[in-house]
């Protein structure tokens, strides 16, 4: 059947098949992302960071921690195709993750130069997302305390 089609029709057919495969792959990747977010959220507060790559070196990092900033679990998605899946990570910069404080990693990453920050951007954004969440919770608690004092 394909041998009877003109060359341009064959090319369009191949492009259509690739488009359909990409759409299906995108669907399953979003489904995997949502399931992973639900699963890691069970461990505590979640910070998500993304490093966009031009072609091959992007990633998505999810860090779960308790309200004190102690890491309970980390997963990362890195790969070049829609077939990539999240996997657990035990270490970052040669240090164990689970049981460590996000603040200890933020101290290290705050000292990174521009090139290192770019390389570890997904990690940095995940840690910073948690720090921002905890600071907002502290500010909210302080505001609530101040309002309670004013009422008395």
For each of these PLM feature ranges, what is it?
Residues 1-9:
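Short, strongly hydrophobic alpha-helical membrane anchors
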Residues 2, 36-43, 88, 93-96, ...:
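Intrinsically disordered, low-complexity acidic regions enriched in Pro/Ser/Thr
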Residues 10-27:
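Single-pass alpha-helical transmembrane signal-anchor segments
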Residues 24-44:
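Transmembrane-cytosolic junction motif
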Residues 46-50:
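Glycine-rich, charged/polar anion/phosphate-binding loops
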Residues 51-83:
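Acidic, Ser/Thr-rich low-complexity segments on the non-lumenal side of membrane proteins
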Residues 70-113:
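Flexible, solvent-exposed short loops/turns enriched in glycine
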Residues 103-152:
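Cytosol-/stroma-facing membrane-proximal "stalk/adaptor" domains immediately downstream
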């Amino acid at each position: 059947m394909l041998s009877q089609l003109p060359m341009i029709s064959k090319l369009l057919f191949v492009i259509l098949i690739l488009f359909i495969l990409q759409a299906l792959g995108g669907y399953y990747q979003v489904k995997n992302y949502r399931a992973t977010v639900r699963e890691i959220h069970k461990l505590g507060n979640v910070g998500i960071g993304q490093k966009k790559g031009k072609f091959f070196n992007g990633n998505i990092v999810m860090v779960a921690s308790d309200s004190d900033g102690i890491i309970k679990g980390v997963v990362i998605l890195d790969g070049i195709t829609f077939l990539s899946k999240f996997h657990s990570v035990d270490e970052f910069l040669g240090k164990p993750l689970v049981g460590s404080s996000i603040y200890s990693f933020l101290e290290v990453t705050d000292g990174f130069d521009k090139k290192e920050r770019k390389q570890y951007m997904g990690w940095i954004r995940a840690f910073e997302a948690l720090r921002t969440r905890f600071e907002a919770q502290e500010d909210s608690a302080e505001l609530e305390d101040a309002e309670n004092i004013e009422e008395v």
